[in-house]
């Protein structure tokens, strides 16, 4: 069975987080990984260059030098290691897994909140507090989605859980109950 990027990403991320903690470099590594993610988002072809046989070794070395020039030793080693083992394309998944582990360590939960209208600052703050308390975390990173089709109420998605208190959801449940036997 082939090992996929999604399978190896948590292993690399965990090892990187532990090494960063040992060297008291967690914030530095986190910031550098966010910058790398931006580079990959802007230039997705970078992820395939090291697997491309038509690109010379000198060009690959030049790219690696550019990528690692301002990086901390931990991030530079991650880049070199993933390139060496043919896992450079896994870097977005590794960064995502690192971010999840980083948030977990920091007591931050990411949540997506869907409402019919935009939340006020006070409402968003109240939801952040409620979600953090519900999941036993310190704070909530809130992604707000406005979807008029929910009619009213709120749908919260966090850690694979969905708490749906929307009017549309209630209507759908009533409709299903009425149509049942």
From Swiss-Prot:
SUPFAM superfamilies from the UniProt entry: N-terminal domain of the delta subunit of the F1F0-ATP synthase
Encoding gene per record: atpH
Gene Ontology MF terms: proton-transporting ATP synthase activity, rotational mechanism
Function according to Swiss-Prot or TrEMBL: F(1)F(0) ATP synthase produces ATP from ADP in the presence of a proton or sodium gradient. F-type ATPases consist of two structural domains, F(1) containing the extramembraneous catalytic core and F(0) containing the membrane proton channel, linked together by a central stalk and a peripheral stalk. During catalysis, ATP synthesis in the catalytic domain of F(1) is coupled via a rotary mechanism of the central stalk subunits to proton translocation.
Subunit-level organization: F-type ATPases have 2 components, F(1) - the catalytic core - and F(0) - the membrane proton channel. F(1) has five subunits: alpha(3), beta(3), gamma(1), delta(1), epsilon(1). F(0) has three main subunits: a(1), b(2) and c(10-14). The alpha and beta chains form an alternating ring which encloses part of the gamma chain. F(1) is attached to F(0) by a central stalk formed by the gamma and epsilon chains, while a peripheral stalk is formed by the delta and b chains.
Topology class, membrane: Peripheral membrane protein
Predominant location: membrane
Keywords per UniProt: ATP synthesis, Cell membrane, CF(1), Hydrogen ion transport, Ion transport, Membrane, Transport
Superkingdom of origin organism: Bacteria
Organism: Lacticaseibacillus paracasei (strain ATCC 334 / BCRC 17002 / CCUG 31169 / CIP 107868 / KCTC 3260 / NRRL B-441) (Lactobacillus paracasei)
Recorded GO CC terms: plasma membrane; proton-transporting ATP synthase complex
InterPro entries per record: ATP_synth_OSCP/delta_N_sf, ATPase_OSCP/dsu
Protein name (record): ATP synthase subunit delta
Compartment annotation: Cell membrane
Family under the similarity heading: Belongs to the ATPase delta chain family.
């Amino acid at each position: 069975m082939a090992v996929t990027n999604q399978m190896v990403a948590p292993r690399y991320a965990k090892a990187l987080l532990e090494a960063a903690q040992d060297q008291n470099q967690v914030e530095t590594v986190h910031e550098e990984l966010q910058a790398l993610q931006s580079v990959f988002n802007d230039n997705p072809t970078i992820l395939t260059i090291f697997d491309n046989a038509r690109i010379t070794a000198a060009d690959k070395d030049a790219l690696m030098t550019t990528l690692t020039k301002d990086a901390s030793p931990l991030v530079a080693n991650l880049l070199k290691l993933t390139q060496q083992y043919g896992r450079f394309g896994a870097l977005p998944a590794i960064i995502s897994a690192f971010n999840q582990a980083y948030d977990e360590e920091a007591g931050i939960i990411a949540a997506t909140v869907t409402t019919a209208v935009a939340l006020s600052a006070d409402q968003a703050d109240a939801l952040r507090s409620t979600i953090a308390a519900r999941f036993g975390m310190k704070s909530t990173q809130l992604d707000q989605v406005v979807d008029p089709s929910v009619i009213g109420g709120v749908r919260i998605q966090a850690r694979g859980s969905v708490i749906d208190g929307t009017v549309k959801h209630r209507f759908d449940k009533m409709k299903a109950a009425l149509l049942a036997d």
